[in-house]
Amino acid sequence: MESLKQKILSEGIVLSDQVLKVDAFLNHQIDPALMQQIGHEFAQRFAGQGITKIVTIEASGIAPAVMAGLELGIPVIFARKFQSLTLKDDLLISKVFSFTKQTESTIAISARHLTAADKVLVIDDFLANGHAAKALIDLIQQAGAQVAGIGIVIEKSFQEGRNLLESEGYRVESLARVAALENGQVRFLD
C-alpha cells in the first residue's frame, strides 16, 4: 500500500535494526485518513470471504481493525491485555509475548462475543515473530470459530512471523512489508 509506505518513510523512526517507531500515525497519534485507507484495503483484500467478525489486540490494532470493520460492515472485538471489573466471566484466555516491550501478557475476550459460527479476520498493527497473531488465533480456536485470514499493517519480513503463520496454513496479508531496518533507513520488500 503505497500511501502507508510513504507515511512510514516520512514519519517512521528507525530505533534499531529490529524496531520501527510509528507513533506519529499508528500507535500513539492516529492518522484517521490513513486508517480509513487501511480499512478499505483490508476490506478489499478479504472481500467475499464470509467474514463475520474482526479480532485484534489492544491498543494499537484497534484503529485499523475498526476501520476494516466499518468497511466490511461487521463487529470488531479487541482482546484486552488485562482483566477489568467488567471482563471477568466466561473468558477465552491466552498469553502473548510482546517483542517491543519484551514482556508476556495475558489477553482475554468474552466468550459471548465469539461463537463457532464465526469466521474471523485477525488484524494487528505489526507482525514480527507472530506471537500476538498466534495468541489471537488461540482465542478464536477456543471459541470453535474459524480463522479466515490475518491482516497486518506493517510486517517485519526479516523476522519469522509470516513463515510461522503460513506454515500453519493461515493466509497473511500485509500492507507494508519491511525487508530491513538498517542505518536508520527502512527498506521495503516489495
Swiss-Prot record:
<dbReference type="GO" id="GO:0046110">
    <property type="term" value="P:xanthine metabolic process"/>
</dbReference>
<comment type="function">
    <text>Converts the preformed base xanthine, a product of nucleic acid breakdown, to xanthosine 5'-monophosphate (XMP), so it can be reused for RNA or DNA synthesis.</text>
</comment>
<feature type="binding site">
    <location>
        <begin position="128"/>
        <end position="132"/>
    </location>
    <ligand>
        <name>5-phospho-alpha-D-ribose 1-diphosphate</name>
    </ligand>
</feature>
<feature type="binding site">
    <location>
        <position position="20"/>
    </location>
    <ligand>
        <name>xanthine</name>
    </ligand>
</feature>
<keyword id="KW-0328">Glycosyltransferase</keyword>
<dbReference type="InterPro" id="IPR029057">
    <property type="entry name" value="PRTase-like"/>
</dbReference>
<dbReference type="InterPro" id="IPR010079">
    <property type="entry name" value="Xanthine_PRibTrfase"/>
</dbReference>
<comment type="similarity">
    <text>Belongs to the purine/pyrimidine phosphoribosyltransferase family. Xpt subfamily.</text>
</comment>
<keyword id="KW-0660">Purine salvage</keyword>
<dbReference type="GO" id="GO:0000310">
    <property type="term" value="F:xanthine phosphoribosyltransferase activity"/>
</dbReference>
<feature type="binding site">
    <location>
        <position position="156"/>
    </location>
    <ligand>
        <name>xanthine</name>
    </ligand>
</feature>
<dbReference type="InterPro" id="IPR050118">
    <property type="entry name" value="Pur/Pyrimidine_PRTase"/>
</dbReference>
<dbReference type="GO" id="GO:0006166">
    <property type="term" value="P:purine ribonucleoside salvage"/>
</dbReference>
<feature type="binding site">
    <location>
        <position position="27"/>
    </location>
    <ligand>
        <name>xanthine</name>
    </ligand>
</feature>
<dbReference type="InterPro" id="IPR000836">
    <property type="entry name" value="PRibTrfase_dom"/>
</dbReference>
<comment type="pathway">
    <text>Purine metabolism; XMP biosynthesis via salvage pathway; XMP from xanthine: step 1/1.</text>
</comment>
<keyword id="KW-0963">Cytoplasm</keyword>
<comment type="subunit">
    <text>Homodimer.</text>
</comment>
<dbReference type="GO" id="GO:0032265">
    <property type="term" value="P:XMP salvage"/>
</dbReference>
<keyword id="KW-0808">Transferase</keyword>
<dbReference type="GO" id="GO:0005737">
    <property type="term" value="C:cytoplasm"/>
</dbReference>
<protein>
    <recommendedName>
        <fullName>Xanthine phosphoribosyltransferase</fullName>
        <ecNumber>2.4.2.22</ecNumber>
    </recommendedName>
</protein>
<dbReference type="Pfam" id="PF00156">
    <property type="entry name" value="Pribosyltran"/>
</dbReference>
